[in-house]
Curated annotation (Swiss-Prot):
InterPro entries: Adenylosuccin_syn_GTP-bd, Adenylosuccin_syn_Lys_AS, Adenylosuccinate_synth_dom1, Adenylosuccinate_synth_dom2, Adenylosuccinate_synth_dom3, Adenylosuccinate_synthetase, P-loop_NTPase. One of its GO terms (molecular function) is GMP binding. Binds 1 Mg(2+) ion per subunit. It comes from Uncinocarpus reesii (strain UAMH 1704). This is Adenylosuccinate synthetase. GO terms for cellular component: cytoplasm.
Amino acid sequence: MVTLVLGSQFGDEGKGKITDLLSQNADLCCRSAGGHNAGHTIIHDNVTYDFHILPSGLISPKCVNLIGSGTVVHVPSFFKELEALEGKGLKDAHKRVFISDRAHVCFDLHSVVDGLEEATLGGRKVGTTGKGIGPCYSDKAARRGVRIGQVLDEGVVETKLRSLEAGYRRRFGELNYDLEAEINRFKEYRTLLKPFVVDQLTLLRKHKDASILIEGANALMLDIDHGTYPYVTSSCTGLGGTIQGLCLNPTQIKSIIGVVKAYSTRVGSGPFPTEQINEIGEKLQVTGREFGVTTGRKRRCGWLDLVMCRYSTAINHYTALNLTKLDILDEFDEIKVAVAYRLEGKEIEFFPSDADVLEKVEVVYDTLPGWKTNTMGITKWEDLPPNAQKYIEYIEKDIGVPIKWVGTGPARSHMIERAQ
């Protein structure tokens, strides 16, 4: 039985909490794509954990965790994150996490190149996290990357890294990068990594009758194929990416949970039709504490975009939704939701593939009354204010997928689970 948790918007929806809840009953928790550019925050027993490349199923003491073949792994960050978790009491974390030997290595060199590539874009910057994810996936696609399994073979990293560095030097000139230092670090990692590296299919076969939880990173609107290209990440962040990155049998998927924030946020550049560059956006940013887990950057904020959510649903085929951060809307007199786009005065029935076109759309809003009541920590549906219930039901009806969970605060316990 496989359960997927996927982001429905631009990321930062709060996927970590529902993953944390579901992982308590999971035997195996997996990351399928992306790298340490992702960021999940989980508050468990009053301890705050920040996850980037590691699956957040590590909080559950019985859960085995896999970083899958579709990911890119920055090895220093892997060990640093593991050390931080063990420092917060997860002493056996190193015994319950494995990396597919087919995952690719994200080098410090890639981070340097990431910054150089952004600089060449001038006013059309993508707004990457600067972690080297794009250049790493580029090297993978060009068949010149290094797989995690190859780190264990003496001399492979040195040969390939020298070749990569020479290629980038020809392109950019001198690099602010210490090639020899990185080569020497990987001589140490060859021994350190060995206990963590596995054949993914062998591990999955051992868990073929187990409860498997797939933790999506980033979100559908950042998908390399289906997102707001080119303002996207460099991996497949939707349903297709999870199947590809983990070699899943699609017939084993029992549920696909889409995580939707009760309003919209975005980090970095790119079109954002419902963005509020005004007091409303500022209020959402401050009240919601909208800062990136990975970069610390302020998130751009706006109203919930149901056009985008319907598009996301059509691609990811959600069977249930988790609406998060409802409590952030507690102090609004009225709340708007985007229900349609207009282009040149006419309502359009498609989601634009061209980012420049998406920048030009006129948003059609519906306005719903606020509830002006504190909802933080509410755990029962009947305890929600009537207008909050109506807001949730409106979203549910528009998207056409049941909202099974409603987040009402940062703690694990701040969640309503509705009977279906």
